[in-house]
Amino acid sequence: MDSDEEFIDNSLAVGDIVYDEAQIAQQQQEYAAQLKLASTAIPTVVKDFIQYFHRCLSDNSVYELHGCYENSFGKLTDKFYKNSHWPHPVAQVAPLVKNDPVFLYFYSELYYRHLYAKLTPTPLERFESYSNYCNLFNYILNSDGPVDLELPTSWAWGIVDEFIYQYNSYWMTKEAHNSDGVAPDTWGTYSVLNVLYSLSEKTKIREQLRAIKAGLDPMDVAGPYGSRPLYKMLGYFCVIGLLRVHTLLGDFTLALKTMESIELTKKALFARVAPAHFATYYYVGICYVMTRRYADAIRCFSHVLTYMARTKNVQGPRYDAKRSEQMYALLAICVVLSPARLDDSIHVALRDRYGDQMAAMQRGDLKLFEELFTFAAPKFIQPGDVHGGDPLKHHLKIFMVDVTNTLSTANLKSYLNLYATMDLGKLASFLDTDAEDLRSQLVTLKMKNRQLRWTEGELADGTYQHCSELDIALENDLIHVAEAKGGRKFADWFIRNTVKNYSVQDYIVNGDKKDKEKKN
């Protein structure tokens, strides 16, 4: 540096913290943006909605809150904020609600949820959303006793669901693996798990579910928190949230174990909220797929897909078309790896969507397995990976090992289907291999035909069962083949074709009248 040049220090020290010129400039821009937001006029109808929303939350008017959450917020979004932010919580909304901190927690939750859905959040906005969730859960968990607040069931699920979605979304970004980000501890895995475990334990939701299962009064074990509807709902949905987080982290056995005492039945609490219903079955099914329990995965996917197909027209915007397609793709994979008889309606829908792909996969097309798995799998994360590796590729690689081993026995099965007994050496000559290698293939086939299968109890429990129509036993060099085919169920076929028959007869009798009505 020349002696004539003058050094100008543009940094600023505030206590022990030193801000450089770039940081100060960034904060100036953010402050200017907030001032601009504050000066932007809020439409009268939006202002009235925010104030009405505030009154409903303060008065614990659950029915009115449900209308605000499910209907009004979405309609106003479409009219005014389809491609822009809602009014800023601090700069614009706080003065309208007398700086009510509780309302601002919940309004901010919706504000950032809308931002994630319609726009692209900046690193600062991701941090602000995380900070708001910290404040919200701190208020719920650490106030002096249970808070006097009630929410609609769908909103309680939405809070937990969005909390995990934003955590997942953060770890899919590059800045998550960069220690120089806005805040290194933003969306930490420990913090997220701590919230979910704290809510589920403080509400004693597992104890309540065990009491219900035993025919006892759950209020006897609920305690002061679990007896309140808000805490009970949040605690319950946090258990499903733990299933989801552990699945995203790749611990599939622990994910199933967190669902202790929650039964997959139509009477379960999650069945009251369609998105929760779909998510629960999807993540349980994924865990079964990744632990090679294909029969259980088929049972899960078949059940929820049947429900989704039957209620599609009444669900409206809550119908998750992408989730449905993902589960059909996973079901196709499972049926190829572990053939099973499906409900007739599901079989037809699956054949229409993936009939050609399934035929190709049965012939050993590994690329199709990879494509369907990549499309259908959740967005796995690996928070501790500073190198930013792709966890999806890691899980795909593990999954494809089992696929390759399973498909390696396909040619062997085609020969065994033709015989009741067969000499080991003769079959080895057919397959152009040696006897020892064939023994290894037979053991692989025997093991692949056995799966851990749920019958009763917890979701992670099960007994090893034979899950194939073909079974083998080896006596010295003689292979014994047993084939068990279950009886076909014709009820669905007769019902469906009877309905078609009636419709054809009706058209034959009244066809002219119906044609005239169409013309008119």
Swiss-Prot record:
InterPro entries: eIF3l, PCI_dom, TPR-like_helical_dom_sf. One of its GO terms (biological process) is formation of cytoplasmic translation initiation complex. SUPFAM superfamilies: TPR-like. Keywords: Cytoplasm, Initiation factor, Protein biosynthesis. It comes from the Eukaryota. GO terms for molecular function: translation initiation factor activity. Transmembrane segments: none annotated. HAMAP family: eIF3l. This is Eukaryotic translation initiation factor 3 subunit L. The lineage of its organism: Eukaryota, Fungi, Dikarya, Ascomycota, Saccharomycotina.
